[in-house]
Regions:
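Active-site mouth of glycoside hydrolases
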Residues: 142-146, 150-151, 172, 306-468
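Extended carbohydrate-recognition surfaces in non-catalytic/accessory domains of CAZymes
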Residues: 28-118, 174-182
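Hydrophobic beta-strand positions in extracellular immunoglobulin-like domains
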Residues: 46, 102-104, 134, 166, ...
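Short acidic/polar inter-strand loop motif in beta-rich domains
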Residues: 167-174, 289-295, 319
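Bacterial N-terminal signal peptides
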Residues: 9-23
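Short, hydrophobic beta-strand segments
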Residues: 149-151, 263-274
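Accessory beta-strand-rich segments of carbohydrate-active enzymes
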Residues: 38, 50, 93-199, 225, ...
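Beta-strand-rich binding/interaction modules
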Residues: 130, 212-253, 260-264
Length: 468
């Protein structure tokens, strides 16, 4: 009888073949400068523990375990009360290394493509290297982030090596089970020099009725070349069947090594509104052209809906008074740990929908992108949470108020809040600003337990998500 491991090996092999086929097609395609957002979860090497020099490309990882992401190494370990904290599941943390070898993506003309790696979440304290060059460090385990690989990619035909170090030695750093490792999806984003940056599109619907809706599209356009470029930018609004609903086109010049912000508007007659009962979705297809050459093409999913709160009568969705019937969902799922298959989330949400639930609070931190997209599709309202700690820590062993000193293994986000909170909050909002399911952002969970500093924190939202 085939085993799970043999099935997984076969799956990984087939995925690798598809990647090779894609690479060949990329080189032969006249429109190869069009963006590709590639599944980068396959063909990773992993080893638990510390390995000196593992960021160096020549490091021998042949004995390391082969795996496909997402991956949570803590759930694979044995439960033990020696791990001291029931809050994090009596499971260990530790140190882990991931490595991946891959070829340099190329455009049709043979030039090296603009290549970025997008992580949806690594728990936690991650540092990423490409070919021995450190790209950066992120302490927060629930935030998406990306790095530009382009300057460090090999151009001589040799493989590149991505190395990721994860430090989960602070294994009592939360009041719930966190997991450890690259537990969310990874993508490789390949574009030309002129492109829409990752999270470079913001779509708002400031005027919505059943007869008419105004859709405002703000698009960042980046020119990484050494010369100015004049481009035509068209954004077409499509319904879920692909029907053209409306279009706006503008022409602009982008100086060398610079970014421009373009604003466009589409009026939609008789819009199909996004609602908890009928979660209708649209797509904004943005194309960037120079003369007849397609430089970039990016699709952004959205929903047309209006949100309003009234202190006396409550919440209104599309002008209709809706009673919020919500639950709190953490990011793990029992025996699969923190690396939750999308099918598990779909089943959970189906059961909750049958029970009459219409809203989810992502306790007590941001959910994965695929979870938010599933809520878009299934008609759930989402309150996206951010942090469980600000500047003062909580005592995780007692799962409550600050009591006594916090030791090393209990150090959580409070140690990094001052330096990282605004950066992380910006990333959280920019990633999810276009998801129609999100109707509220929360700046912190039970923060009165640590330090009441609401005014400066809400100032971050004024720069990022005020209209949301």
């Amino acid at each position: 009888m085939p085993t799970y491991r043999s099935f997984l090996s076969a799956f990984v092999f087939c995925t690798h073949i598809l990647w090779l086929a894609f690479s060949s097609a990329l080189a032969a395609n006249d429109d190869a400068s069009i963006r590709q957002e590639l599944d980068f979860n396959f063909d990773w090497k992993f080893s638990l523990g510390e390995h000196s020099g593992a960021q160096v490309p020549a490091f021998d990882d042949s004995s390391w375990r082969d795996l496909r992401l997402p991956h949570d190494w803590s759930i694979e370990a044995e439960y033990s009360q020696e791990n001291t904290s029931g809050a994090t599941g009596y499971l260990p943390g530790g140190l882990g290394w991931y490595r991946k070898h891959f070829a340099t993506p190329e455009l049709a003309n043979g030039e090296v493509a603009k290549t970025q790696i997008l992580f949806d979440g690594i728990y936690n304290h991650s540092e990423v290297w490409i070919n021995g060059h450190s790209l950066g460090y992120r302490p927060f385990g629930y935030v998406a982030f990306y790095y530009d690989l382009t300057p460090f990619l090999n151009t001589d035909g040799s493989d590149n090596v991505i190395a990721v170090h994860v430090d989960r030695s602070r294994y009592v750093d939360s009041r719930w089970y966190t997991g450890s490792g690259i537990y969310r999806n990874v993508k490789l984003v390949v574009t030309g020099e002129v492109h829409v940056p990752i999270w470079g599109t913001t779509i708002l619907t400031p005027e919505v009725t059943s007869e008419r809706a105004k859709v405002l599209i703000s698009t960042e356009l980046r020119n990484d070349s050494e010369q100015a470029r004049v481009v035509n930018v068209s954004t077409t609004l499509l319904d879920d069947s692909g029907l053209n609903i409306g279009r706006d086109m503008k022409r602009l010049e982008i100086a060398a090594r610079s970014t421009e912000l373009l604003r466009q508007e589409v009026i939609v007659a008789n819009p199909q509104l996004w609602d908890i009962d009928n979660p209708n979705l649209y797509f904004a297809q943005t194309e960037v052209r120079s003369e007849e050459q397609l430089l970039d093409s990016k699709s952004t999913r959205l929903g047309i809906r209006s949100l309003r709160n009234d202190a006396k009568t409550g919440f209104f969705l599309n002008g209709r008074n809706v009673k919020i019937k919500g639950v709190n969902l953490h990011h793990d799922a029992g025996l699969v740990g923190a690396a939750v298959p999308i099918g598990v989330w779909k089943r959970r949400l189906e059961v909750l929908k049958e029970a009459g639930v219409n809203a989810i609070r992502t306790g007590h931190k941001p959910a994965s992108k695929e979870f938010i997209e599933l809520c878009d599709e299934m008609g759930f309202l989402v309150q996206q949470e951010t942090f469980d700690e600000w500047e003062r820590p909580k005592n995780k062993r007692r799962n409550g108020r600050h009591q006594g000193e916090i030791d090393y293994i209990e150090q959580g986000y409070s140690e990094f809040f001052t330096e990282w909170a605004e950066k992380d909050l910006t990333a959280i909002i920019r990633r999810d600003i276009n998801n129609p399911s999100i109707f509220q952002w929360s700046i912190g969970n039970e923060i009165e337990w640590s330090y009441p500093r609401y005014i400066p924190a809400t100032g971050y939202f004024g720069k990022n998500g005020k209209s949301k």
